[in-house]
């Protein structure tokens, strides 16, 4: 019984902490919707696009990639069994 009281109190406190934030977000959305309907103009009268700063004379830095040695597969003596012996070898001594 004590655990249910503690869990319900925790849930209540969590709702108290979260609810004002949700209310602020919903209020901000409503304000943005109202401003969009009013067709609000910028007080300065223009908007300036953000342009990245480019310093001439410096080439862009290329990312450094570590150089790996070339991959050479090594022979594994236990991976493949030796071929079976031939039934009729070419250089067999004749009787």
Curated annotation (Swiss-Prot):
Main location class: secreted
One GO term (biological process): response to bacterium
Keyword Signal attached: yes
Miscellaneous: Absent in the susceptible ecotype cv. Oy-0. Only present in ecotypes resistant against X.campestris pv. campestris race 750 (e.g. Xcc750).
Organism listed in the record: Arabidopsis thaliana
A GO cellular component annotation in the UniProt record: extracellular region
This protein's UniProt keywords: Cell wall, Secreted, Signal
Cleavable signal peptide: 1-27
Tissue: Expressed in leaves, flowers and stems, but not in roots.
UniProt induction comment: Accumulates upon infection by the phytopathogenic bacterium X.campestris pv. campestris (both compatible and incompatible strains Xcc168 and Xcc750, respectively), agent of black rot. Accumulates at higher levels in light than in darkness. Repressed by MIF1.
Lineage per the UniProt record: Eukaryota, Viridiplantae, Streptophyta, Embryophyta, Tracheophyta
Protein name, per record: Protein ECS1
Location within or outside the cell: Secreted, Cell wall
Function noted in UniProt: Maybe involved in defense responses to X.campestris, but probably not a X.campestris pv. campestris race 750 (e.g. Xcc750) resistance gene; according to genetic data, linked to a locus influencing resistance to Xcc750.
